[in-house]
């Protein structure tokens, strides 16, 4: 029997914190339609992701994937930095 390949969940968001060692906080924003009024409303969630090389900084646009739990609240890992933040 061949094992079925699992689909890996990936999300895209902005880094809002890089103060922890090898960990970033990513803000994921999505739009959902209100069930009664039909207006689109922004919903967001913050996820902790593993950044092995500490390459991300605040404001970077990144892609993360779901992985095994690495800590109590960290079960996502950095895949790619899509866009660097503008340095002032």
Curated annotation (Swiss-Prot):
GO cellular component: cytosolic small ribosomal subunit
InterPro entries: NA-bd_OB-fold, Ribosomal_uS17, Ribosomal_uS17_bact/chlr
GO biological process, one term: translation
Keyword entries, A-Z: Ribonucleoprotein, Ribosomal protein, RNA-binding, rRNA-binding
Keyword rRNA-binding recorded: yes
Keyword check for Electron transport: no
Gene Ontology molecular function, alphabetical: rRNA binding; structural constituent of ribosome
Role noted for this protein: One of the primary rRNA binding proteins, it binds specifically to the 5'-end of 16S ribosomal RNA.
Entry-linked NCBIfam families: PRK05610.1, uS17_bact
Quaternary structure and partners: Part of the 30S ribosomal subunit.
Family recorded in the similarity comment: Belongs to the universal ribosomal protein uS17 family.
Protein name (database record): Small ribosomal subunit protein uS17
Gene coding for it: rpsQ
